[in-house]
Amino acid sequence: MSTPLQGIKVLDFTGVQSGPSCTQMLAWFGADVIKIERPSVGDVTRHQLRDIPDIDALYFTMLNSNKRSIELNTKTAEGKEVMEKLIREADILVENFHPGAIDHMGFTWEHIQEINPRLIFGSIKGFDECSPYVNVKAYENVAQAAGGAASTTGFWDGPPLVSAAALGDSNTGMHLLIGLLAALLHREKTGRGQRVTMSMQDAVLNLCRVKLRDQQRLDKLGYLEEYPQYPNGTFGDAVPRGGNAGGGGQPGWILKCKGWETDPNAYIYFTIQEQNWENTCKAIGKPEWITDPAYSTAHARQPHIFDIFAEIEKYTVTIDKHEAVAYLTQFDIPCAPVLSMKEISLDPSLRQSGSVVEVEQPLRGKYLTVGCPMKFSAFTPDIKAAPLLGEHTAAVLQELGYSDDEIAAMKQNHAI
Protein backbone atom coordinates (compact mmCIF):
# COMPACT_ATOMS: atom_id res chain seq x y z
CA MET A 1 0.00 0.00 0.00
CA SER A 2 1.34 3.41 -0.98
CA THR A 3 1.77 5.91 1.85
CA PRO A 4 1.94 9.74 1.70
CA LEU A 5 5.56 10.02 2.90
CA GLN A 6 6.95 6.90 1.27
CA GLY A 7 10.58 7.57 0.28
CA ILE A 8 11.02 10.42 2.79
CA LYS A 9 13.91 9.88 5.23
CA VAL A 10 13.76 11.55 8.65
CA LEU A 11 16.57 11.86 11.20
CA ASP A 12 14.98 11.87 14.64
CA PHE A 13 17.31 13.63 17.06
CA THR A 14 14.56 14.10 19.65
CA GLY A 15 13.74 12.88 23.12
CA VAL A 16 10.96 12.79 25.72
CA GLN A 17 7.62 13.82 24.15
CA SER A 18 7.40 16.97 22.03
CA GLY A 19 9.81 15.82 19.31
CA PRO A 20 8.96 12.10 19.31
CA SER A 21 5.24 12.83 18.94
CA CYS A 22 6.03 14.73 15.74
CA THR A 23 8.39 12.15 14.25
CA GLN A 24 6.09 9.28 15.20
CA MET A 25 3.36 10.86 13.08
CA LEU A 26 5.81 11.19 10.18
CA ALA A 27 6.55 7.48 10.57
CA TRP A 28 2.84 6.65 10.59
CA PHE A 29 2.54 8.54 7.31
CA GLY A 30 5.19 6.28 5.79
CA ALA A 31 8.48 8.12 6.30
CA ASP A 32 11.61 6.15 7.21
CA VAL A 33 12.29 7.66 10.64
CA ILE A 34 15.73 6.88 12.06
CA LYS A 35 15.90 7.64 15.77
CA ILE A 36 19.46 8.57 16.76
CA GLU A 37 20.20 7.63 20.38
CA ARG A 38 23.14 7.69 22.77
CA PRO A 39 24.89 4.29 22.95
CA SER A 40 23.80 2.13 25.89
CA VAL A 41 21.49 4.90 27.17
CA GLY A 42 18.99 5.93 24.54
CA ASP A 43 16.02 8.23 24.95
CA VAL A 44 15.53 9.03 28.64
CA THR A 45 11.91 7.88 28.43
CA ARG A 46 13.05 4.30 27.87
CA HIS A 47 13.82 4.28 31.61
CA GLN A 48 11.16 6.61 33.04
CA LEU A 49 7.99 5.40 34.78
CA ARG A 50 8.70 1.75 34.09
CA ASP A 51 6.02 -0.82 34.87
CA ILE A 52 8.29 -3.78 34.03
CA PRO A 53 11.91 -3.86 35.30
CA ASP A 54 14.64 -3.47 32.65
CA ILE A 55 12.10 -3.18 29.81
CA ASP A 56 11.45 -0.08 27.70
CA ALA A 57 8.83 2.01 29.49
CA LEU A 58 5.43 2.68 27.97
CA TYR A 59 6.43 6.35 28.01
CA PHE A 60 8.92 5.47 25.25
CA THR A 61 7.01 2.79 23.36
CA MET A 62 3.89 4.95 22.95
CA LEU A 63 5.84 7.81 21.36
CA ASN A 64 8.25 5.97 19.07
CA SER A 65 6.32 3.38 17.10
CA ASN A 66 7.22 2.63 13.47
CA LYS A 67 10.74 4.07 13.86
CA ARG A 68 14.19 2.57 13.45
CA SER A 69 16.76 3.06 16.21
CA ILE A 70 20.51 3.48 15.89
CA GLU A 71 23.07 4.12 18.62
CA LEU A 72 25.49 6.89 17.61
CA ASN A 73 28.08 8.83 19.58
CA THR A 74 28.39 12.14 17.75
CA LYS A 75 31.24 13.23 20.04
CA THR A 76 33.60 10.88 18.18
CA ALA A 77 35.11 11.55 14.76
CA GLU A 78 33.54 8.39 13.36
CA GLY A 79 30.18 9.31 14.84
CA LYS A 80 30.35 12.75 13.23
CA GLU A 81 31.21 11.15 9.90
CA VAL A 82 28.17 8.88 10.13
CA MET A 83 25.99 11.83 11.09
CA GLU A 84 27.21 13.80 8.09
CA LYS A 85 26.41 10.91 5.75
CA LEU A 86 22.94 10.58 7.28
CA ILE A 87 22.29 14.29 6.79
CA ARG A 88 23.45 14.09 3.18
CA GLU A 89 20.78 11.46 2.41
CA ALA A 90 17.96 12.78 4.63
CA ASP A 91 14.93 14.89 3.78
CA ILE A 92 14.11 16.06 7.31
CA LEU A 93 16.03 16.38 10.58
CA VAL A 94 14.12 17.04 13.80
CA GLU A 95 15.69 18.02 17.13
CA ASN A 96 14.43 19.30 20.48
CA PHE A 97 17.67 19.77 22.40
CA HIS A 98 18.41 22.63 24.77
CA PRO A 99 19.25 25.81 22.77
CA GLY A 100 22.71 25.56 21.22
CA ALA A 101 23.19 21.84 21.88
CA ILE A 102 23.17 20.67 18.27
CA ASP A 103 25.44 23.58 17.31
CA HIS A 104 27.98 22.36 19.85
CA MET A 105 27.97 18.98 18.09
CA GLY A 106 29.27 20.78 15.02
CA PHE A 107 26.01 20.76 13.09
CA THR A 108 24.89 24.35 12.87
CA TRP A 109 22.12 25.23 10.45
CA GLU A 110 24.70 26.84 8.17
CA HIS A 111 26.81 23.68 8.12
CA ILE A 112 23.77 21.49 7.54
CA GLN A 113 22.84 23.63 4.52
CA GLU A 114 26.33 23.09 3.12
CA ILE A 115 25.99 19.32 3.51
CA ASN A 116 22.47 19.09 2.12
CA PRO A 117 20.71 22.25 0.87
CA ARG A 118 17.47 20.28 0.38
CA LEU A 119 17.22 19.21 4.01
CA ILE A 120 14.37 20.54 6.15
CA PHE A 121 15.51 21.20 9.71
CA GLY A 122 12.73 21.06 12.31
CA SER A 123 13.54 22.46 15.73
CA ILE A 124 11.51 22.56 18.95
CA LYS A 125 12.44 24.95 21.75
CA GLY A 126 10.66 26.11 24.86
CA PHE A 127 10.61 29.73 23.77
CA ASP A 128 11.26 31.80 20.69
CA GLU A 129 14.71 33.29 20.17
CA CYS A 130 13.45 36.79 21.00
CA SER A 131 11.86 35.70 24.29
CA PRO A 132 13.47 36.73 27.60
CA TYR A 133 12.98 33.09 28.61
CA VAL A 134 14.90 31.71 25.63
CA ASN A 135 17.43 29.90 27.85
CA VAL A 136 14.87 28.53 30.31
CA LYS A 137 14.51 24.76 30.22
CA ALA A 138 10.96 23.99 29.19
CA TYR A 139 8.79 21.00 29.93
CA GLU A 140 5.08 20.35 29.53
CA ASN A 141 3.81 22.40 32.46
CA VAL A 142 6.37 25.17 31.96
CA ALA A 143 4.91 25.72 28.49
CA GLN A 144 1.34 25.66 29.82
CA ALA A 145 2.26 28.30 32.39
CA ALA A 146 3.98 30.56 29.85
CA GLY A 147 1.48 30.05 27.02
CA GLY A 148 -1.65 31.29 28.79
CA ALA A 149 -3.26 27.93 29.55
CA ALA A 150 -2.55 27.73 33.29
CA SER A 151 -3.73 31.26 34.10
CA THR A 152 -7.10 30.58 32.48
CA THR A 153 -7.62 27.01 33.76
CA GLY A 154 -9.18 26.21 37.12
CA PHE A 155 -11.79 27.84 39.32
CA TRP A 156 -11.97 31.56 40.01
CA ASP A 157 -11.36 31.11 43.74
CA GLY A 158 -8.38 28.76 43.29
CA PRO A 159 -4.85 28.80 41.86
CA PRO A 160 -3.91 28.37 38.20
CA LEU A 161 -4.07 24.75 37.05
CA VAL A 162 -2.28 22.80 34.34
CA SER A 163 -4.15 20.45 32.03
CA ALA A 164 -3.54 16.71 32.01
CA ALA A 165 -3.58 16.88 28.21
CA ALA A 166 -0.14 17.42 26.68
CA LEU A 167 -0.72 20.98 25.49
CA GLY A 168 2.96 21.80 25.82
CA ASP A 169 4.53 18.60 24.50
CA SER A 170 2.47 16.58 22.01
CA ASN A 171 0.62 19.69 20.88
CA THR A 172 3.94 21.33 19.99
CA GLY A 173 4.91 18.20 18.07
CA MET A 174 1.69 18.36 16.05
CA HIS A 175 2.28 22.03 15.26
CA LEU A 176 5.82 21.27 14.06
CA LEU A 177 4.46 18.41 11.96
CA ILE A 178 2.25 20.86 10.07
CA GLY A 179 5.25 23.11 9.48
CA LEU A 180 7.41 20.25 8.20
CA LEU A 181 4.75 19.08 5.76
CA ALA A 182 4.37 22.66 4.49
CA ALA A 183 8.15 22.87 4.08
CA LEU A 184 8.14 19.64 2.06
CA LEU A 185 5.57 21.13 -0.31
CA HIS A 186 7.59 24.34 -0.51
CA ARG A 187 10.69 22.33 -1.41
CA GLU A 188 8.80 20.87 -4.36
CA LYS A 189 8.51 24.43 -5.70
CA THR A 190 11.95 25.78 -4.81
CA GLY A 191 14.22 22.75 -4.61
CA ARG A 192 15.58 23.96 -1.27
CA GLY A 193 15.03 23.02 2.33
CA GLN A 194 14.49 25.43 5.17
CA ARG A 195 14.50 25.69 8.94
CA VAL A 196 11.17 25.29 10.75
CA THR A 197 11.19 26.34 14.39
CA MET A 198 8.41 25.77 16.89
CA SER A 199 8.33 27.07 20.43
CA MET A 200 6.29 25.29 23.07
CA GLN A 201 5.01 28.63 24.34
CA ASP A 202 3.68 29.50 20.87
CA ALA A 203 2.01 26.11 20.47
CA VAL A 204 0.13 26.53 23.76
CA LEU A 205 -0.80 30.11 22.90
CA ASN A 206 -2.21 28.98 19.57
CA LEU A 207 -4.71 26.84 21.50
CA CYS A 208 -5.52 29.76 23.79
CA ARG A 209 -6.58 32.16 21.05
CA VAL A 210 -10.12 32.44 22.48
CA LYS A 211 -8.58 33.66 25.73
CA LEU A 212 -6.66 36.35 23.84
CA ARG A 213 -10.02 37.21 22.25
CA ASP A 214 -11.55 37.48 25.72
CA GLN A 215 -8.68 39.65 26.98
CA GLN A 216 -9.42 42.24 24.30
CA ARG A 217 -13.14 42.12 25.06
CA LEU A 218 -12.43 42.50 28.77
CA ASP A 219 -10.19 45.51 28.09
CA LYS A 220 -13.06 47.23 26.29
CA LEU A 221 -16.07 46.12 28.36
CA GLY A 222 -14.72 45.47 31.84
CA TYR A 223 -16.66 42.20 32.05
CA LEU A 224 -17.22 38.92 30.18
CA GLU A 225 -20.86 37.98 30.06
CA GLU A 226 -20.38 34.26 29.42
CA TYR A 227 -18.15 33.72 32.46
CA PRO A 228 -19.68 32.51 35.76
CA GLN A 229 -18.49 35.69 37.50
CA TYR A 230 -21.06 37.69 35.53
CA PRO A 231 -23.15 39.54 36.68
CA ASN A 232 -22.60 39.22 40.43
CA GLY A 233 -18.84 38.66 40.62
CA THR A 234 -15.95 40.99 40.00
CA PHE A 235 -13.51 41.10 37.10
CA GLY A 236 -9.89 42.15 37.30
CA ASP A 237 -7.77 43.36 34.41
CA ALA A 238 -6.89 39.85 33.13
CA VAL A 239 -9.04 37.02 31.78
CA PRO A 240 -10.19 35.05 34.84
CA ARG A 241 -10.47 31.33 35.40
CA GLY A 242 -13.96 30.10 34.55
CA GLY A 243 -14.11 26.62 36.07
CA ASN A 244 -15.99 24.27 33.77
CA ALA A 245 -17.84 27.01 31.90
CA GLY A 246 -18.03 26.63 28.14
CA GLY A 247 -16.12 29.80 27.30
CA GLY A 248 -17.40 29.92 23.75
CA GLY A 249 -20.71 31.69 24.23
CA GLN A 250 -22.54 28.43 24.96
CA PRO A 251 -22.84 27.89 28.76
CA GLY A 252 -21.73 24.46 29.90
CA TRP A 253 -20.97 22.63 33.12
CA ILE A 254 -19.99 19.29 34.61
CA LEU A 255 -23.02 17.61 36.19
CA LYS A 256 -23.23 14.72 38.63
CA CYS A 257 -24.77 11.42 37.59
CA LYS A 258 -25.83 8.35 39.52
CA GLY A 259 -22.96 6.87 41.50
CA TRP A 260 -20.92 10.07 41.78
CA GLU A 261 -20.42 9.48 45.50
CA THR A 262 -18.07 6.55 44.82
CA ASP A 263 -17.18 6.88 41.13
CA PRO A 264 -14.91 9.90 40.47
CA ASN A 265 -16.01 9.94 36.82
CA ALA A 266 -19.78 9.57 37.18
CA TYR A 267 -20.41 12.90 35.47
CA ILE A 268 -21.45 14.35 32.13
CA TYR A 269 -20.67 17.63 30.42
CA PHE A 270 -23.86 19.50 29.52
CA THR A 271 -24.06 22.44 27.10
CA ILE A 272 -26.92 24.91 26.79
CA GLN A 273 -27.39 26.17 23.24
CA GLU A 274 -29.39 29.32 22.61
CA GLN A 275 -31.02 27.82 19.51
CA ASN A 276 -31.90 24.64 21.40
CA TRP A 277 -33.27 26.17 24.60
CA GLU A 278 -36.83 24.98 23.97
CA ASN A 279 -35.70 21.36 23.64
CA THR A 280 -33.54 21.73 26.74
CA CYS A 281 -36.52 22.89 28.78
CA LYS A 282 -38.59 19.96 27.55
CA ALA A 283 -35.81 17.48 28.32
CA ILE A 284 -35.46 18.57 31.95
CA GLY A 285 -39.19 18.93 32.58
CA LYS A 286 -39.26 22.72 32.73
CA PRO A 287 -41.49 23.75 29.78
CA GLU A 288 -42.53 26.91 31.63
CA TRP A 289 -39.01 28.29 31.18
CA ILE A 290 -39.52 28.47 27.42
CA THR A 291 -41.65 31.61 27.67
CA ASP A 292 -40.54 32.91 31.07
CA PRO A 293 -38.77 36.26 30.44
CA ALA A 294 -36.27 35.41 33.18
CA TYR A 295 -35.07 32.38 31.17
CA SER A 296 -36.09 32.86 27.55
CA THR A 297 -32.81 34.43 26.32
CA ALA A 298 -29.15 33.70 26.99
CA HIS A 299 -28.69 37.20 28.44
CA ALA A 300 -31.62 36.70 30.82
CA ARG A 301 -30.43 33.25 31.87
CA GLN A 302 -26.88 34.18 32.81
CA PRO A 303 -27.73 35.53 36.31
CA HIS A 304 -29.51 32.22 37.01
CA ILE A 305 -27.05 29.91 35.26
CA PHE A 306 -26.01 27.97 38.36
CA ASP A 307 -29.66 27.55 39.39
CA ILE A 308 -30.39 26.20 35.91
CA PHE A 309 -27.55 23.68 36.07
CA ALA A 310 -28.63 22.67 39.59
CA GLU A 311 -32.11 21.97 38.24
CA ILE A 312 -30.69 19.89 35.38
CA GLU A 313 -28.51 18.00 37.86
CA LYS A 314 -31.60 16.97 39.83
CA TYR A 315 -32.36 14.78 36.81
CA THR A 316 -28.87 13.61 35.83
CA VAL A 317 -27.99 12.52 39.38
CA THR A 318 -30.75 9.91 39.22
CA ILE A 319 -29.41 7.99 36.22
CA ASP A 320 -26.20 6.51 34.85
CA LYS A 321 -24.03 8.89 32.79
CA HIS A 322 -24.46 6.84 29.62
CA GLU A 323 -28.24 6.76 30.08
CA ALA A 324 -28.21 10.52 30.62
CA VAL A 325 -26.33 11.12 27.37
CA ALA A 326 -28.60 8.75 25.44
CA TYR A 327 -31.68 10.57 26.74
CA LEU A 328 -30.38 14.10 26.21
CA THR A 329 -29.15 13.30 22.71
CA GLN A 330 -32.78 12.70 21.72
CA PHE A 331 -33.27 16.42 22.33
CA ASP A 332 -30.17 17.38 20.32
CA ILE A 333 -28.38 18.60 23.46
CA PRO A 334 -24.56 18.69 23.17
CA CYS A 335 -23.26 16.48 25.97
CA ALA A 336 -20.84 13.66 26.69
CA PRO A 337 -20.00 11.27 29.51
CA VAL A 338 -16.80 11.95 31.42
CA LEU A 339 -14.85 8.87 30.31
CA SER A 340 -12.06 7.52 32.47
CA MET A 341 -8.86 6.24 30.86
CA LYS A 342 -9.98 2.76 31.95
CA GLU A 343 -13.18 3.16 29.94
CA ILE A 344 -11.28 4.54 26.95
CA SER A 345 -8.81 1.64 27.00
CA LEU A 346 -11.69 -0.85 26.86
CA ASP A 347 -13.94 1.02 24.40
CA PRO A 348 -14.57 -1.33 21.43
CA SER A 349 -15.44 1.56 19.11
CA LEU A 350 -12.00 3.13 19.64
CA ARG A 351 -10.37 -0.21 18.84
CA GLN A 352 -12.49 -0.56 15.71
CA SER A 353 -11.61 2.94 14.48
CA GLY A 354 -7.90 2.45 15.14
CA SER A 355 -7.80 5.24 17.71
CA VAL A 356 -6.53 2.74 20.29
CA VAL A 357 -4.25 0.02 18.93
CA GLU A 358 -2.70 -3.10 20.44
CA VAL A 359 0.87 -3.76 19.27
CA GLU A 360 3.58 -6.18 20.35
CA GLN A 361 7.24 -5.49 21.09
CA PRO A 362 9.73 -8.39 21.32
CA LEU A 363 10.65 -7.88 25.00
CA ARG A 364 7.64 -6.06 26.40
CA GLY A 365 4.96 -8.11 24.73
CA LYS A 366 1.55 -6.64 23.90
CA TYR A 367 0.59 -3.12 24.93
CA LEU A 368 -1.93 -0.46 23.97
CA THR A 369 -0.98 2.75 22.23
CA VAL A 370 -2.86 5.68 20.75
CA GLY A 371 -3.35 5.21 17.02
CA CYS A 372 -3.39 7.76 14.24
CA PRO A 373 -6.13 10.33 14.93
CA MET A 374 -6.59 11.15 11.23
CA LYS A 375 -8.63 8.70 9.17
CA PHE A 376 -7.71 8.56 5.48
CA SER A 377 -9.76 7.11 2.65
CA ALA A 378 -6.73 6.07 0.56
CA PHE A 379 -4.54 4.44 3.21
CA THR A 380 -4.58 3.22 6.80
CA PRO A 381 -1.46 3.76 8.94
CA ASP A 382 -0.01 0.45 10.07
CA ILE A 383 0.96 1.04 13.70
CA LYS A 384 3.98 -1.06 14.67
CA ALA A 385 5.97 -1.49 17.88
CA ALA A 386 8.68 0.91 18.99
CA PRO A 387 12.26 -0.22 18.28
CA LEU A 388 14.65 -1.67 20.81
CA LEU A 389 17.71 0.47 21.54
CA GLY A 390 20.10 0.22 18.59
CA GLU A 391 17.98 -2.44 16.92
CA HIS A 392 18.75 -1.09 13.44
CA THR A 393 22.28 0.28 13.87
CA ALA A 394 23.98 -2.28 11.65
CA ALA A 395 21.30 -2.13 8.95
CA VAL A 396 21.40 1.67 8.71
CA LEU A 397 25.21 1.73 8.58
CA GLN A 398 25.23 -0.92 5.87
CA GLU A 399 22.81 1.22 3.86
CA LEU A 400 25.37 4.04 4.16
CA GLY A 401 28.02 1.74 2.66
CA TYR A 402 29.90 0.61 5.77
CA SER A 403 31.30 -2.93 5.82
CA ASP A 404 30.90 -5.38 8.68
CA ASP A 405 34.54 -4.82 9.65
CA GLU A 406 34.09 -1.04 9.71
CA ILE A 407 30.97 -1.41 11.82
CA ALA A 408 32.83 -3.67 14.25
CA ALA A 409 35.64 -1.11 14.48
CA MET A 410 33.19 1.68 15.24
CA LYS A 411 31.71 -0.48 17.97
CA GLN A 412 35.18 -1.04 19.39
CA ASN A 413 35.84 2.72 19.33
CA HIS A 414 32.52 3.50 21.09
CA ALA A 415 31.23 5.45 18.10
CA ILE A 416 28.13 3.27 18.02
Swiss-Prot record:
One Pfam family named in its UniProt record: CoA_transf_3
Reaction(s) catalysed (UniProt annotation): formyl-CoA + oxalate = oxalyl-CoA + formate
Active site: D169
GO MF assignments: formyl-CoA transferase activity
EC primary class: transferase
GO biological process, one term: oxalate catabolic process
Entry's family note: Belongs to the CoA-transferase III family. Frc subfamily.
Name used for this protein in its record: Formyl-CoA:oxalate CoA-transferase
Organism field: Escherichia coli O6:H1 (strain CFT073 / ATCC 700928 / UPEC)
Gene that this sequence comes from: frc
